[in-house]
Structures are given as C-alpha cells and as structure tokens.
Swiss-Prot record:
InterPro entries tied to this protein: 3-OHacyl-CoA_DH_CS, 3-OHacyl-CoA_DH_NAD-bd, 3HC_DH_C, 6-PGluconate_DH-like_C_sf, ClpP/crotonase-like_dom_sf, Enoyl-CoA_hyd/isom_CS, Enoyl-CoA_hydra/iso, FA_oxidation_alpha_subunit
Keywords for this protein: Fatty acid metabolism, Isomerase, Lipid degradation, Lipid metabolism, Lyase, Multifunctional enzyme, NAD, Oxidoreductase
Taxonomic source organism: Vibrio atlanticus (strain LGP32) (Vibrio splendidus (strain Mel32))
Region of interest: Enoyl-CoA hydratase/isomerase: 1-189
PROSITE patterns: 3HCDH, ENOYL_COA_HYDRATASE
Task of the protein: Involved in the aerobic and anaerobic degradation of long-chain fatty acids via beta-oxidation cycle. Catalyzes the formation of 3-oxoacyl-CoA from enoyl-CoA via L-3-hydroxyacyl-CoA. It can also use D-3-hydroxyacyl-CoA and cis-3-enoyl-CoA as substrate.
Residues binding NAD(+): M325, D344, V401, V402, E403, K408, S430, N454
E.C. numbers: 4.2.1.17, 5.1.2.3, 5.3.3.8, 1.1.1.35
Family label: In the N-terminal section; belongs to the enoyl-CoA hydratase/isomerase family. In the C-terminal section; belongs to the 3-hydroxyacyl-CoA dehydrogenase family.
Gene3D superfamilies according to UniProt: 1.10.1040.50, 2-enoyl-CoA Hydratase, Chain A, domain 1, NAD(P)-binding Rossmann-like Domain
Protein name: Fatty acid oxidation complex subunit alpha
Pathway: Lipid metabolism; fatty acid beta-oxidation
Residues at the active site: H451
KW Kinase (keyword) present: no
Length: 723
C-alpha cells in the first residue's frame, strides 16, 4: 500500500502502475474537504514512490465521484473572500499536482463523474468508461460555476464551443455523447475496464501513446485565432444571455471566465476562474440555489425515512376517476413501476385517461427515453375498469373524481367497504377539507389528502394532507408512494387551501387590490415576471388556472379566512367570472388567446377587457415597480409565515420547496423564507408596516416581529462549515 486514508487508498497494481481508488465509507464518493486533503497527501506519496510508471484513478462505487460536498458550500461561501480564494487555490493546486505527475494518468469510470468529479478526471491524461458513465458540470444550476479547473481544462480538451454548451447548461453527457465530443477516449465493457486501463497506461508509459502532447494542450492557452475567439464567445454570450435571463448570472459569468482565460496558460487561467467563482459564490443567487438543493435533499431524506418507517410498501395502486388528471396519476404510477387500476363510471373518461397515458409514453418513446417493449409493459400495467372488481388488491387508492364534497365522500365511503382494513385511501383535492371528507369513513385513520398538481407528469410537488385522525402509518405509506412515483411529497396539516393554495390566494388578493386602486394588469405582469422573476404574472396565471376555478377557490378561502381573505364588494376575478371570461380554457380572460403554429396558446392584449374591469377598478394610476412587487408579495409572504407559525407546514425547508415546486416561485430567490433572510427580516417588517392600512392581509405576523427583535433568520443552521 502506497497510501491509505478514510476515503481513498493508493496501491501498486503491476509494473510500476499504481491505482488511486476513491472508497469513501458512505454510499457515494464526494470531494469533500477531508477527501481533498487526503488526495493531496496521496499525490505527495506517489511523487515520492520509486519506480512509478503510471497512475489509474478508480472508484469502488457504482458512481465514480458525484461531485463536491454541497452540504459544505454555504458555510464556505459565508467565509470572507480572501479565505474562500485561499481554499480554491488549495483545491486547484491539488488537481494541478495530479496533472503534473511525471507519469501518464488515466481515469477509469463507471456511473456519474459530476462537478468536482468531472474536474478531477479532466486533470488526467486519458479517460475511459463503461456505458453507464455520465460526465458533466452541473454547477451553474447551483448559481456558481466550475471552480476546480473545469472552465480551464474542459475547453482545452473538447474545444471552447462544446465546453461552453456543457458548462452553461449544467449538462451531463451520456457515455456516447462524451465519446463523441472527446470527453471520453473509449467506452469499454465493464468487466474489461481495468484491463483496458492498464494496457492504455502501459502503452503511454512505453511512449506508444503521446500523453505529454495531451498534457501540453491542457496546460497551454486555447488554440483559437482572434477571429475564431471573437465569433465563438460573442455568439455564446448572446445565446446564454437570452436563455438564462438577468436573474441567473452563473452561465454568462462562466462564458466570460473562459473567454478571459483563453489566451493564458493553465496557472494564470485558474487564477481567472477562481476570481469569477468567488464573485458568484458570494451572490444571493448562489446562496438561494444551493439552499434549494439542500432543501431538496432534506425532502428526499424525509421521504426515505417515511419509507423505512412504513409497515407496508405500495405494490399496487388504484385511481378512482379517469380523464386527464386520473390518467396522469395512473401514468406516473405505472411509469415508476407501481401497477395501477384506473376506475371510472364512464367509458369515455377511461379512454381519455388511457389516451393521456399513451400520449405521454409516446413522447418518451420519440425522445429515446424508453423503447417500444418497455412502453408496452408500462401501458399494460394500467388496468382501466368500469367496475370495482380487483380494487381490493390495491395498497393505496387515490380518489380523483370531480371536485364536489358530496361526490367525493360517497365514492370514498363506497370503496372503503370493498377493501381491506389496512388499505390506505387518499383524496386528490385542492379545496375540500380532509377532515370533512373523513367524516364519511369508518377508518379515518387510513385516510389523508394527496394533492397532485397539473400537469401531473411535469409538476414535482405532491401535498400530503394530514387530517385530524390520520395515522402516522398512513402518512408514511403515502409519502413513500409519492416518492416512489418520482415526486417530492411535502406533508401539511389540514386547513382551507392546505398550504399552496392557501398562500396563493393572498397573492391574488394583493393583485386584485392593486387593480382596484387603478394599476395596469399588463404592467403588474411585466414587473412580477421580469423584475421579481415569476414564470408568469398574476393576471396571466389566473388565465392559466381558469377564472372559474379561481372564483370558486377564492370563495372557499374567504369562508376559511374571512378576516384576511374575505372582501367587500366585487373584484376583478368576480367581474371576469360573471362575463364568462375564464382564461385560456375558453380563449378569453385578462388576455385573449389564439393558437400559434406549434399549437400552443398565444396571448394578446385586447381592449375588450377594459369596460369589464372599469366596474371594479378606480381611475388608472401608475405605480412604480417596487410598490407593485411589495403590494403583491407581502400578503403571500405573511400567509406563508402564518402557516409555519400555525404548524400547517413543519419547516422553512418544506415551505420553500413547496413554493418553488408547486407555484414556480423564482428559484434564484430560494423561496419565501430564503427571500426573507436575504432582504433581512427586520427590513421586511419595517417595509411591510408601511402598508398595514391596506387591511388584514398586510398585518405582519407575530413570528416575524419576534425574530426581527432578536435579529434571527430562518436558515442560520445551513451556514455551519469550517475550512
């Protein structure tokens, strides 16, 4: 043994060829601070080892290295710039030490080599993998950029254009893609990887392969003429700015770093990369996006724990109520390996549900994400039926019939009498209280809400609603089933609107009050989209949701929370509903809709809307961007905080993920609680107080007043780390 540490070891294989194996005791290998320090010492040991002729990097896991340890990021990023720069300089020196070994080096991969894992293999002279190999640099998705030499080495290995595409998109290349661009030198059968690696390094050591030429290319300036460089970088900056937009600086910063470093040798180029990395790491966007990643891991951890705690796994399921929603739920269940019965009283609805599942599978087939054989298997695992025969075999039943409490209660009561005592019943409802539906059941402990969002196959969030009598076993089983379906389940306690709809309607309330006071809805949409970062402004969102749906839900919320969500007189939602302007579904709402060449709805402004709004709005008045944002967002933020205060949702992490996954809250802001931390709770309280005369929706919750007085924040705990 040449060197051994907790997460890696080095030994000689044969004829002076050594193997450095990453072998962390955890389930995956990560380049955390401890592993980097061990790698540095291992390379010193290799440099001192007599008779060394070559080095092969390997991993004892199914994935090579999944990247740096992101749990350390926020703590590191909170350090002063000089300390962060010093940490990066140390990391860079390690990979340069690997690259400068006086012998040929090769990375032998299976599975993922991502982020720091990719940057590690870029420091070696050769790279081979099996067909499971996936190599990429996802850092820009976290609001940062490669900082271990990825922006320096990747362009020199595969060319600037291909490198910028991978880096700016946070893309991972499959083995065949990596081979095509030159990121992999060969794809080898898994059982022949080691033999192939030894042969390649032996050939290089015997000067049959020019490893030194490869190394020189990586450590020199990019071989681009001035004209080529100008065309390449100008085009890349234009495309990236258009795609990423102004709220996500990481992609464009990475292009600028590659451009600035293009004419420098490796060490000078690494200095340039490091400067830009530090700038991004200190940004609020990076803090928010890294925080979201950590929150997502937290949600996955809760789901994993629920699965382990449940006494029974879901092997079969049933969906009651077909159509688009039922078909989407059945598709998602079958796609992830849980056979499902889809029951409806109408043949036409069953056909609609099966057509929805078939359409979604055909899309995957056309994109090469599954083959015809697998598609047929998935489709055959959905059993459409007009009868209940076979429903007793289901472990979990999802009721997805029409949004009517009497109909839902009747269906749930009926099916409860046909299934075993340990079968779990759920209701896919967006507005009907779970405690109300539970009254129709003999075993309410086996019942909870399971609120899917439309379209089911795209929306990652599922709200799991705990009723007054719901058992922990029921929650665990349904959370585990939702996770098995590939969804992000978040448990909330029962209340009108649950969590997502409860916090959405104060947002619509703030919007309606702005309209009442004379604001232009098209300007509000532009400000909320372009300045705050929502995918669509409130008027456009109401059109997509449907003004009829919003009108009904608004009445439910007003009944549940009359002080904050009740209103005097009619508002814009009422006016459009009465005028039968329901939005996209019937071609006219706040905007008018037509179908474009691709068959997608295209919105335009029509003055036909103005007389309808005139009845519920005052004389036109101009509001500045900041006022618009504050008046629309304060009611939502307050309601989110009240949900935490009341225990409707358990943690800031779960709330922020629900907002991003369920409503499209701008990811670069990280969710309401991350946003409050970034602006400062004290600052928010002072700002919100200036609007309190607008009504109860604008009253600051006691929790925020208390935290502001103590100088607290919601995410203090995520900063813990040390250099």
């Amino acid at each position: 043994m040449i060197y051994q540490a907790n997460t890696l070891q080095v030994k000689e294989l044969q004829d002076g060829i050594a193997e450095l194996s990453f072998c962390a005791p955890a389930s995956v290998n990560k380049l955390d601070l401890a592993t980097l320090e061990s790698l540095d010492k291992a390379l010193d040991a290799l440099n001192a080892h007599a008779g060394l002729r070559g080095l092969i990097l390997t991993s004892n896991k199914d994935a090579f290295i999944v990247g740096a340890d992101i749990t350390e990021f926020l703590g590191l990023f909170a350090k002063p710039e000089a300390e962060l720069d010093e940490w990066l300089r140390f990391a860079n020196s390690i990979f340069s030490k690997l690259e400068d070994l006086p012998v040929p080096t090769l990375s032998m991969m299976r599975g993922h080599a991502l982020g720091g894992g990719c940057e590690c293999v870029l420091a070696t002279d050769f790279r081979i993998g099996d067909k499971t190999t996936s190599i990429g640099l996802p850092e820009t998705k976290l609001g940062i950029m490669p900082g271990f030499g990825g922006c320096v080495r990747l362009p020199r290995v595969i060319g600037a254009d291909s490198a910028m595409e991978i880096i700016t998109q946070g893309k991972a290349c499959r083995a065949d893609e990596a081979l095509k661009v030159g990121l992999l030198d060969a794809i080898v059968e898994t059982d022949q990887l080691l033999e192939s690696a030894i042969n390649t390094v032996s050939l290089a050591a015997n000067e049959k392969l020019d490893w030194q030429l490869r190394r020189k290319q990586k450590t020199s300036a990019l071989s681009l003429s001035k004209l080529e460089a100008m065309m390449s970088f100008t085009m890349a900056k234009g495309l990236v700015a258009q795609k990423a937009g102004p709220h996500y600086p990481a992609p464009i910063t990475s292009v600028i770093a590659i451009e600035e470093a293009a004419r420098s040798d490796r060490d000078a180029a690494l200095d340039i990369e490091r400067k830009h990395f530090v700038k991004l790491a200190k940004s609020e966007e990076a803090k928010a996006l890294v925080g979201l990643f950590l929150n997502d891991q937290y949600i996955k951890g809760l789901a994993k724990h629920a699965g382990k705690s449940a006494n029974k796994a879901t092997e079969r399921a049933a969906v009651l109520g077909a159509g688009i929603m039922g078909g989407g739920i059945a598709y998602q269940s079958a796609l992830k390996g849980v056979p499902v019965m889809m029951k409806d009283i109408a043949q036409a609805s069953l056909e609609l549900g099966m057509n929805e599942a078939s359409k979604l599978l055909n899309k995957r087939l056309s994109r090469g994400r599954l083959d015809g054989f697998k598609m047929a298997g998935i489709l055959s695992s959905i059993t459409p039926s007009l009868h209940y025969a076979g429903v007793e075999q289901s472990d979990v039943i999802v009721e997805a019939v029409v949004e009517n409490p009497k109909v839902k209660a009747a269906v749930l009561s009926e099916v409860e009498g046909l299934v075993g005592e340990d079968t779990v019943l759920t209701s896919n409802t967006s507005t009907i209280p779970i405690n109300l539906l539970a009254k129709s059941l003999k075993r309410p402990e086996n019942f909870c809400g399971m609120h899917f969002f439309n379209p089911v196959h795209r929306m990652p969030l599922v709200e799991i609603i705990r009723g007054e009598h719901t058992s922990e076993e029921t929650i665990n089983r349904v959370v585990a089933y939702a996770a098995k379906m590939g969804k992000s389940p978040i448990v909330v306690n029962d209340c009108p609107g649950f969590f997502v709809n409860r916090v959405l309607f104060p947002y619509f309330g703030g919007f309606s009050m702005l309209l009442r006071d004379g604001a232009d809805f098209t300007k509000i949409d532009k400000v909320m989209e372009r300045k705050f970062g929502w995918p669509m402004g409130p008027a456009y969102l109401l059109d997509v949701v449907g003004l009829d749906t919003a009108h009904h839900a608004q009445a439910v919320m007003a009944q549940g929370f009359p002080e904050r969500m009740g209103k005097e007189g009619r508002d814009a939602i009422d006016a459009l509903y009465v005028a039968e302007k329901y939005g996209q579904k019937n071609g006219s709402g706040f905007y008018t809709y037509s179908v474009d060449k691709r068959g997608r709805p295209k919105k335009t402004f029509s003055e036909d809307i103005l007389p309808i709004l005139a009845d519920v709005c005052q004389q036109p008045q101009d509001f500045d961007d900041q006022t618009i944002i504050q008046r629309v967002m304060i009611p939502m933020i307050n309601e989110v905080v009240l949900c935490l205060e009341e225990g409707i949702i358990a943690t800031p992490q779960e709330a922020d993920m629900a907002l991003v996954y369920g409503l499209g809250f701008p990811p670069f802001r990280g969710g309401v609680f991350r946003y409050l931390d970034s602006v400062g709770i004290g600052n928010f309280v002072e700002m919100a107080k200036s609007y309190q005369d607008l009504g109860a929706m604008y009253q600051v919750p006691q929790l925020l007043l208390d935290m502001a007085a103590k100088g607290e924040s919601f995410y203090d705990g995520q900063q813990a780390s040390s250099l």
